[in-house]
Design a protein with these regions (language model features):
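Lumenal/extracellular "mature" regions of secretory-pathway glycan-modifying transferases
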Residues: 163, 174-177
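A conserved hydrophobic secondary-structure block that centers on an alpha-helix together
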Residues: 184-188, 195-198
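Active-site glycine-rich loop that binds ribose-phosphate moieties when present
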Residues: 180-182
Length: 558
């Protein structure tokens, strides 16, 4: 279904580390060695971009069906996010066994150390997956896709890969600075260092917890308070996991029946069906369970009814404010007036985040009232001229999620248009799996799928099986390619918007509404109808594929 060609010669890569890497190509070029065994002049049935959960799931699924399949990975190893995200304190926010492959040959020979694995343990897990099913033999590492086009005559994609030379310039700042998504593998010693964390999303929270106890001083630059939830991490014994694995097949089936792909689901009643005392008990139980229980296992109207949502926020506020000593900080970190509806931004999980601000060495800088202006040689300068001198900066401001993954690949449609320009006014997909004008191209955990409103491995399994079945149907029916119809894509977009409009998500800027990237369309990017409904709808579309796709037969196979 595709081939790989070399682009024009690029500058010779160097192994010199980047001072401040901000893209996949920056990180990839910082790793030397070869571009992998499959990088050049390749003709395969399927090319997969990325060697994380989704890529590995697709590799095994398609290989099991006899298809020649390889992965192009920008990094230097498998693991996807967990090869990039190695900042201090990085850990997953889904619990074991929700966050793992459902293949018996993998889980029966693996035991976790805790119920919320760190990035180090997740790297070990992906190495284990490779040993069991053989991933790396079909991977080209340090290989960045920068362009791809489809030939309607041959029914194949041609993809281009290249190296990018190191960042040519350095800014004025003389200290150490790294983005959380491109953290160096080597540890940064922050003892006796003045440190700063810019951003209070998941990575900002985790870095703050890691640096707070050891840095000489730490300043956390906050625009919006993080409505974080308790993680409740605990060790897992081998004996406990051996007992649990008897139920894994049932648990893996169940996670696909819950709204968000976790091993728990909404209560079958609304907030005000209960008395105030009963609500308190429900909230308390979910809070003590930890993880996302307080987000997606309380009342079913919590993300839909403003008054119901205020009740959950009041409980959250009471719990968190009791942990913060300073009254002024208490109001900044857990304000009585909610900054936005609870849960319309994906909550982060924390262990002792709020307690860090009880330390004399940890402070909060409000950059909503006084934004960052620029960096100086010594540190961070705010709009009013205040300069914060720091030795180490962690930039935890997030990245262009969901749609950015697709638009950075240099994809060209059969009409000759670039996906990046097509999606500038807003993303257009069919089923959250395909894009009109890009035949035989499928995406997982991206725009208009459950994605950020779901547990990653669960969504990957639902979408990955669909893609494998779609490709099998193409092969079995003598089809050259399928191309989503524009009217079907428009109908799917309308469906995504209508579902989202029933929720509280449109009330604030968040990753669910396109993120905070300047100039990016403000629109829903995730399917908010729940994983079971989504799975049913995409299956019906595959059964009746000629309603949503132009199905082009291969004359040579008829």
């Amino acid at each position: 279904m595709g081939s790989v060609q070399d682009p024009p010669a690029a500058s010779t890569p160097t192994s010199t580390p980047q001072k401040f890497s901000t893209s996949l190509t920056d990180y990839s070029s910082a790793h030397a060695a070869s571009s992998g065994p499959y990088a050049d002049n390749l003709d395969v049935d399927a090319l997969i971009v990325g060697a994380g959960f989704a890529g590995i799931f697709m590799l095994k699924s398609l290989r099991d069906r006899g298809l020649r399949t390889v992965i192009f990975e920008a990094g230097n190893d498998t693991g996807g996010t967990w090869r990039w995200n190695c900042y201090p304190g990085a850990a997953v926010d889904s619990e074991v066994p929700e966050y793992e492959f459902s293949w018996p040959e993998v889980y029966e020979t693996w035991n976790w150390k805790s119920n919320y694995p760190t990035y180090q343990e997740l790297r070990e897990y992906f190495d284990h997956v490779d040993r069991v099913i053989g991933v790396k033999k079909d991977c080209a590492f340090n290989t960045v896709v920068v362009g791809a086009a489809f030939d309607t005559r041959s029914g194949k994609w041609s993809a281009a890969k290249r190296w990018i030379p190191p960042w040519p310039g350095l800014d004025k700042y003389r200290g150490i600075i790294h983005h959380s998504s491109f953290w160096p593998d080597s540890e940064i010693d922050v003892r006796d260092k003045r440190c700063a964390v810019i951003g209070t999303g998941a990575s900002g929270v985790q870095i703050t917890q890691a640096w707070g106890p050891i840095a000489s001083s730490l300043k956390v630059f906050q625009r919006t308070p993080n409505l974080a939830l308790p993680m409740r991490r605990r060790p897992l014994s081998t004996e406990e996991q051996i007992r649990s694995k008897r139920f894994y097949p049932e648990l893996f089936r169940y996670r696909e029946t819950s709204f968000a792909g976790f091993l728990y689901d909404w209560a079958e009643k609304n907030t005000f069906d209960d008395s105030a005392a009963e609500r308190e008990d429900t909230y308390e139980k979910a809070w003590n369970e930890g993880g996302f229980h307080f987000w997606v296992s309380i009342y079913k109207d919590n993300l839909f009814n403003p008054e119901a949502n205020k009740e959950s926020y009041k409980f959250w506020c009471k719990k968190v404010r009791s942990r913060i000593g300073d009254p002024a900080l208490r109001e900044k970190l857990a304000p009585k007036k909610m900054p936005h509806y609870f849960g319309v931004k994906r909550p982060c999980l924390e262990t002792n985040y709020y307690e860090q601000f009880n330390r004399e060495t940890v402070g909060l800088v409000d950059i909503k009232e006084n934004p960052i202006s620029h960096f100086s040689e010594r540190g961070i300068v705010l709009q009013d001229g205040t300069e914060h001198e720091v030795d180490v900066v962690a930039v935890a401001t997030g990245f262009d999620v969901v749609t950015g993954v697709m638009t950075q690949l240099g994809l060209t449609s059969i009409e000759g248009t670039a996906l990046e320009q097509e999606w500038a006014p807003g993303a257009q997909t069919y089923l959250g799996l395909t894009v009109s004008g890009y035949p035989n191209m499928f995406h997982i955990y991206g725009a208009h799928g459950p994605t950020l409103l779901s547990n990653g491995p669960t969504a990957v399994a639902v979408q990955g099986r669909w893609i494998a079945d779609a490709i099998a149907k193409i092969e079995a029916n003598g089809v050259k390619y399928i191309n989503p119809k524009k009217e079907a894509s428009e109908k799917w977009k309308k469906r995504v918007v209508e579902l989202n409009d029933k929720t509280l998500f449109p009330s604030t800027t968040s990753t669910y509404m396109g993120g905070t990237i300047p100039g990016k369309a403000y629109e829903p990017v995730c399917y908010s109808g729940g994983l079971p409904t989504y799975a049913k709808e995409i299956r019906e579309a595959l059964d009746n594929w000629e309603e949503g796709f132009d199905v082009v037969r291969d004359a040579a196979k008829l």
